[in-house]
């Protein structure tokens, strides 16, 4: 296999970096749930 010729350590770095933004998109998802609870207060 010629896949061993490629540096797996360098190709693996960009992979985890793309996962960081994926986690940052989750915080806003939780903030959207807060307003949902405030709607019950006025109720």
UniProtKB/Swiss-Prot annotation:
Residues 1-23 are annotated as: Disordered. Keywords: Allergen, Repeat, Seed storage protein, Storage protein, Vacuole. It is found in: Vacuole, Aleurone grain. Residues 21-40 are annotated as: 3 X 6 aa tandem repeats of P-F-V-Q-Q-Q. GO terms for cellular component: aleurone grain; vacuole. GO terms for molecular function: nutrient reservoir activity. Sequence repeats lie at residues 21-26, 27-34, 35-40. Residues 10-23 have a biased composition (Low complexity). Seed storage protein. Serves as a source of nitrogen, carbon, and sulfur for the young developing seedling. Monomer. Belongs to the gliadin/glutenin family. This is Avenin-F. It comes from Avena sativa. The lineage of its organism: Eukaryota, Viridiplantae, Streptophyta, Embryophyta, Tracheophyta.
């Amino acid at each position: 296999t010629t896949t061993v010729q490629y540096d797996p350590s360098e190709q693996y770095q960009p992979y985890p970096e793309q996962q960081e933004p994926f986690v940052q998109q989750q915080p806003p998802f939780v903030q959207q749930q807060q307003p949902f609870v405030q709607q019950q207060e006025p109720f």
